[in-house]
């Protein structure tokens, strides 16, 4: 029996004239995530991540996004940073922020506008006393200049979760709610 872990959601919009996507170069996505892990670490093991990518070619996976990753350094927080995918390989293109906002009710917003990639993540869930003492960011705001030409024609969305199911087949999962995409 072959065991797999992780999941990918790929969305490529219709480019029919009535949709208007062929003339709209800017894009944003907003979603809500509920990780099953409640301490802020988001995933079962270090190295597991969630990428929320826009302006993506869903065949080659070239595009831009936000990476939310569990690291070995923290058991109650994740790191977030902007990435660029080139042929399925991601590279960091911004500073890294350690945050405790990847818990129930985490809102994730990623936007590309005129060559600027921006992302925000936040929650209304209060941090623990320990998280406050450690000085983790309550929310994240990141920006990177990525240029107007590279990936300009791409209109796809990629959501990539590399985590495992965990015990009872759900304890390491992340529920996604209300994914909305805007082209402008």
What label would you give each PLM region?
Residues 53-57, 83-85, 120-124, 184:
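Predominantly extracellular/luminal cell-surface or secreted proteins
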Residues 29, 100-144:
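Carbohydrate-binding surfaces in secreted/extracellular proteins
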Residues 84-109:
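Short, aromatic/His-centered strand-loop micro-motif at the edge of beta-sheets
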Residues 33-37, 58, 86, 112-114, ...:
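Beta-strand elements of well-folded, non-transmembrane domains
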Residues 24-26, 131-132, 137-184:
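Ligand-recognition surfaces built from glycine- and aromatic
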Residues 59-72, 91, 125-142:
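Acidic Ser/Thr/Pro-rich low-complexity disordered segments
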């Amino acid at each position: 029996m072959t065991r797999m872990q992780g999941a990918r959601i790929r969305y490529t919009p219709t480019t029919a004239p009535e949709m208007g996507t062929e003339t709209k170069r800017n894009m944003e996505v907003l979603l809500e995530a509920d990780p099953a892990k409640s301490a802020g670490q988001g995933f079962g093991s270090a190295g597991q991540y969630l990428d929320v990518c826009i302006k993506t070619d869903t065949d080659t996976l070239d595009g831009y996004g936000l990476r939310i990753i569990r690291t070995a350094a923290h058991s109650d927080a994740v790191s977030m940073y902007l990435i660029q995918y080139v042929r399925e390989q991601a590279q960091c293109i911004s500073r890294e922020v350690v945050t405790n906002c990847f818990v129930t009710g985490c809102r994730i917003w990623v936007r590309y506008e005129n060559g600027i990639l921006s992302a925000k993540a936040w929650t209304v869930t209060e941090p623990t006393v320990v998280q406050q003492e450690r000085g983790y960011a309550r929310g994240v705001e990141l920006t990177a200049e990525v240029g107007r030409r590279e990936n300009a024609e791409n209109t796809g969305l990629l959501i990539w979760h590399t985590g495992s199911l965990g015990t009872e087949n759900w304890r390491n999962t992340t529920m996604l709610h209300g994914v909305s995409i805007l082209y402008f």
